[in-house]
Amino acid sequence: MKKILVLFALLMTGVMGIHAQEGLKWGAMAGVNSSKFSTDGFDSKVGFHVGIKAEKDLPQIAQGVYLDMAALLSLKGTQINGNDASLKFNPYYLEIPIHMGYKYAINDNFAIFGNFGPYFAVGLFGKMKATGYLIDEVEGLTSIHDSAKVFGSNAMKRFDFGLGLKAGVEFFQKYQVSIGYDWGLLDNIEDSGNKNRNLMLSVGYFF
């Protein structure tokens, strides 16, 4: 955890340095995830994301066009719920989305925006947790609780890549509320066909 905090501090320092040099607009964002795997049989699971973000206007392309970037700690995963057992995947990622966007100002205090582009993610830590019951002829009903690391050779892959889409509103050029969706393009477990899917509701603040 200490290494992760140091990494986020370095990322924030880097963004602040770029901001000072090139006039980037930067701030913080956080929100709720609803994630699952792409194949049948998996249920959505609630998680979160939190981190820093930056926007860079690109007037050389067109007025209103901008580059949207972020560095987020994101809890994704999925769950399987049966009558007698359940299994939860709780992977934490360092996620870096890099999107091209367009922002249209209705007036000085209100704007709408949308952006689209790739994201890159590296698995940091997390657990797979299994709970359930076994029926034994002698002992009767036995409760089972077990967990294992979510990333590894027999578990989820650490690296993920995909595409994301986001739309939202901005108030007073400082506050944002947005909804987005990420489509993972890589199998998150070897040869499984499972890919990450994630619906996000976010709020942001620019310093």
Task: Map each language-model feature to its residues.
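Sec-dependent N-terminal signal peptides
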Residues: 4-14
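Membrane-embedded beta-strand positions of outer-membrane beta-barrel proteins
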Residues: 28-30, 67-71, 98, 114-116, ...
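Transmembrane beta-strands of outer-membrane beta-barrel pores
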Residues: 32-36, 56, 73-77, 104, ...
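Extracellular/periplasm-exposed beta-strand and loop segments of Gram-negative cell-envelope proteins
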Residues: 37-43, 76-92, 123-160, 164
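Transmembrane beta-barrel domains of outer membrane proteins
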Residues: 53-57, 99-103, 166-170, 204-206
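Repeated loop/turn-to-beta-strand initiation elements of outer-membrane beta-barrel proteins
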Residues: 59-65, 110, 173-179
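Outer-membrane beta-barrel "beta-signal"
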Residues: 195-207
